[in-house]
Design a protein with these regions (language model features):
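Boundary at the C-terminal end of the N-terminal hydrophobic targeting segment
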Residues: 34-36, 42
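An N-terminally biased module of ancient metal coordination in phosphate/nucleic-acid-related enzymes
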Residues: 16-17, 44-148
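N-terminal export leaders
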Residues: 11-27
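Active-site gating/metal-coordination segments in enzymes
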Residues: 48-64, 123-237, 243-247, 259, ...
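N-terminal secretory signal peptides
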Residues: 1-11
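Short acidic/histidine-rich active-site segments
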Residues: 253-257, 294-297
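Conserved, mostly hydrophobic/aromatic
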Residues: 80, 109, 156, 222, ...
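H/E-rich (His + Asp/Glu) clusters that bind or coordinate divalent metals
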Residues: 60, 262-323
C-alpha cells in the first residue's frame, strides 16, 4: 500500500477507499481508478501507536490488522507515493517493492515530489531537478524488468517554484530533460492557515498564495507544456483553488488528500463546522471540469479521525461505514 509513504501512516488502501463517503458525512465521492492514499504528516510528538520518529512506520501495529486482498486481478495505477532516505525512515526501491508486491495488481506508480535528493550545489531554483534525476534512476531500474512487472515511478511529479513567475520555464525544461519522458507535472504545496498553528510546506507559502500574480505567471507556464498541477492545501483554501481552476481552464489540477480537511489544533473540536466548510469548498471546486481529486489522505495526522491513537488499525466493513 504505497501511499503509506507520505509519512507512512497506518490505514490501508481498502479502508480509505471504501470509507471515504461515510467518514466525510456521506458526501457522494467517486473515483475512476483505484487510488493508494495512505498518509500522515510529521508531528511534533509521537502518537500512541507510532514510534518516536513521526516519519517512521510502526510495523508491529500495522501487522495487527491483516486485510483480504480485494479484486487481486484489478489493474491499479498508484497515483501518489514518495521515495526518501531520512534518519530512521528509509523508503526507497526495496520498501516500495514490498508494498507493491503485497497482493494487489499494481501496474504502474506515480512518484510525487517530497524534497528528496535535491542537488547539493548550483542555482537554488534548479536544486529540485536532483530529485527527478534520482527518481528517474529508480524508474529505469524498474523498467529493466529485474524487479517484476510493475513499472515503478512510471510517472514523475516534481517541484518547481512558481514564485519565479515566467522564470520557472527554465526549471520546467530542466525537469523535463531529467525525467526522460516520465515527467508529468509539478506540485508546489500551498498549505497555509490563518491561525498559524498548522504545519507549513517547505515552500513557505503566504496567505493567498494562489492569487499572487507572479505565482500565477509561473502557473501559466504549465498548460503549454501539457503539465499537471498537484494541489496540496488545507480545506479553508478550497475556494482559492476554485478561483485558480476557473482562471486556468486548460490546466489539469489534481487535488491531493480530498482537499485537506483539518482536525488538529484549533480545528480539533470543530468537526461539524470543518465538514460544512469543506463541503462548500469542494462543491465549488467540483464546478471546474479541469480538477480531479485523489481520494485518500484521511489517515494523515492533520486529519479528523485520530486513527493512530487506536489499539489496532481501523477496518471498514462496508462502503460508507463509519470507523
Amino acid at each position: 500500500m504505497t501511499e503509506k509513504t507520505i509519512r507512512r501512516q497506518s490505514v490501508s488502501r481498502r479502508t480509505l477507499l471504501s470509507g471515504t463517503a461515510g467518514l466525510l458525512g456521506g458526501a457522494a465521492l467517486s473515483s475512476g481508478t483505484a487510488l493508494a492514499q495512505n498518509t500522515a504528516p510529521a508531528s511534533t510528538s509521537a502518537p500512541v501507536n507510532s514510534p518516536a520518529s513521526p516519519r517512521s512506520p510502526d510495523p508491529a501495529w500495522l501487522a495487527l490488522r491483516q486485510e483480504e486482498i480485494i479484486e487481486p486481478g484489478l489493474e491499479i495505477v498508484d497515483p501518489h507515493h514518495h521515495l526518501w532516505d531520512h534518519s530512521g525512515d528509509r523508503f526507497l526501491l526495496d520498501q516500495l517493492l514490498t508494498d507493491t508486491n503485497s497482493g494487489h495488481n499494481i501496474a504502474q506508480t506515480v512518484f510525487i515530489e517530497c524534497g528528496s535528493m535535491y542537488r547539493a550545489d548550483g542555482p537554488v531554483e534548479m536544486k529540485p531537478v536532483g530529485e527527478t534525476e534520482f527518481v528517474n534512476g529508480t524508474a529505469a531500474m524498474s523498467a529493466s524488468g529485474r524487479y517484476g512487472p510493475t513499472r515503478l515511478c512510471h510517472g514523475i511529479v516534481g517541484h518547481a517554484d512558481l514564485r519565479l513567475g515566467d522564470g520557472v520555464a527554465r526549471v520546467l525544461e530542466a525537469q523535463t530533460v531529467a525525467g526522460d519522458g516520465r515527467f508529468r507535472g509539478i506540485r508546489h504545496s500551498v498549505t497555509w492557515d490563518a491561525t498559524g498553528t498548522l504545519p507549513k510546506a517547505r515552500t513557505n507559502p503566504i496567505k493567498g498564495q494562489m492569487y499572487d500574480a507572479t505565482w500565477r505567471a509561473g502557473f501559466a507556464r504549465l498548460a503549454p507544456l501539457d503539465m499537471t498541477f498537484e494541489a496540496w492545501l488545507y480545506h479553508p483554501q478550497l475556494l482559492e483553488l476554485a478561483d485558480l481552476a476557473r482562471a486556468f481552464p486548460q490546466t489539469t489540477i489534481i487535488l491531493n488528500h480530498v482537499g485537506g480537511p483539518v482536525g488538529i489544533g484549533p480545528y480539533k473540536d470543530t468537526k461539524a463546522e470543518t465538514f460544512a466548510q469543506w463541503k462548500t469548498g469542494i462543491a465549488e471546486v467540483a464546478k471546474s471540469p479541469n480538477v480531479v481529486v485523489k481520494l485518500g489522505g484521511l489517515g494523515m495526522l492533520f486529519g479528523m479521525f485520530d486513527f493512530h491513537t487506536r489499539e489496532t488499525p481501523p477496518f471498514v466493513v462496508g462502503a460508507g461505514a463509519r470507523l
